[in-house]
Swiss-Prot record:
GO cellular component, one term: cytoplasm
Organism this protein belongs to: Escherichia coli O6:H1 (strain CFT073 / ATCC 700928 / UPEC)
Pfam families, sorted: QRPTase_C, QRPTase_N
Molecular functions (GO terms): nicotinate-nucleotide diphosphorylase (carboxylating) activity
Family: Belongs to the NadC/ModD family.
Protein name: Putative pyrophosphorylase ModD
Family annotation (InterPro entries): Aldolase_TIM (IPR013785), ModD (IPR006242), NadC/ModD (IPR027277), Nicotinate_pribotase-like_C (IPR036068), Quinolinate_PRibosylTase_N_sf (IPR037128), Quinolinate_PRibosylTrfase_C (IPR002638), Quinolinate_PRibosylTrfase_N (IPR022412)
Keyword entries, A-Z: Glycosyltransferase, Transferase
Further remark: Orthologs of this gene seem to exist only in pathogenic strains of E.coli but not in the K12 strain.
Length: 284
């Protein structure tokens, strides 16, 4: 489970409600008891539920019912129902709706990608990068895990990943073996992941025996050719495809023999459509 502190929950609320709801205050309806319900209009893999519930309870509302993160919801299915005074209900309305719509959009997009991949490779995986929309990293991580994806890198201190921009600063930027050996000496507990931008670089990298080789923006044909020769050059190396991988392009790579894909596309998916209904207690 990804942990969000109370301060982070408060920040999600404060973006919208720091001054309260003027309309509710002017109508003098804030003291009335009522319910709020969130419905997913189109169906799909949901996330952001636990965060949404924490936001609602922070406002003093009581959760009556909620689905679980990662659930496959039907079109029109209720995701959350909470109760409390109308002032708190209206304060939570849009802030929570925004979290749910963005989170569910991310998780459902990734779930669709995984379903497509696993029709071809049941053991296939998709890892999502740290290139999330600024300020959304923790929500994004929750959504990725809810959909069944992997977190590629939570931060640059978590894993070793040798890019061309690192090699540019080396005395010999084509000395893959030297770079990989140095990384192994100085980070002996970590797997060594490297990225190649061309087939020539990929072959040179494989000869240096990395643990994982990322192929960046390779065509399906180039990826297939590398996948065919990799077992003889580096039998213990895992291949991954990255760069431009999304729901539309993924199908072009399903025959190349690579089972791990790296993407940031889900973060930019269309938000889910969440319907919100607020009603006084007497009408429920």
């Amino acid at each position: 489970m990804i942990f969000l502190s109370q301060a982070q929950i408060d920040a999600l609320l404060l973006e919208d409600i720091q001054g309260g709801d003027l309309t509710t205050r002017a109508l003098n309806i804030g003291h009335q008891h009522g319910y709020i319900e969130f419905f997913l209009r189109q169906g799909g893999c949901v996330s952001g539920i636990s965060v949404a519930c924490k936001m609602l309870t922070t406002l003093g509302l009581t959760i009556d019912d909620a689905v679980s993160d990662g659930s496959q919801a039907n079109a029109g299915q209720r995701l959350i129902r909470a109760q409390g005074n109308a002032a708190a209900l209206h304060q939570g309305w849009k802030a929570v709706q925004n979290v749910l719509e963005w989170s569910c959009g991310v998780s459902d997009y990734l779930a669709q990608m995984l379903a497509l991949l696993r029709e071809r490779y049941p053991d296939g995986n998709i890892a999502c990068t740290r290139k999330a929309i600024p300020g959304t990293r923790l929500l994004a991580s929750q959504a990725i895990l809810a959909a069944g994806g992997l977190i590629h890198r939570a931060g640059c201190a978590e894993t070793i990943l040798l890019f061309a921009n690192h090699r540019h600063f080396l005395h010999d930027n084509q000395d893959w073996s030297g770079a990989i050996n140095q990384l192994r000496r100085h980070a002996p507990e970590k797997k060594i992941v490297v990225e190649a931008d061309t087939p020539k670089e990929a072959i040179a990298a494989l000869r240096a025996q990395p643990d994982v080789l990322q192929l960046d923006k390779f065509s399906p044909q180039q990826a297939t050719e590398i996948a065919q020769i990799a077992p003889s050059l580096a039998p213990h190396c895992t291949l991954a495809l990255t760069g431009g991988i999304n729901l539309t392009t993924l199908k072009n790579y399903l025959d190349c023999g690579i089972r791990l894909f790296i993407t940031s596309a889900p973060y930019y998916a269309a938000p889910a459509d969440i319907k919100v209904s607020l009603q006084p207690a007497a009408s429920i």
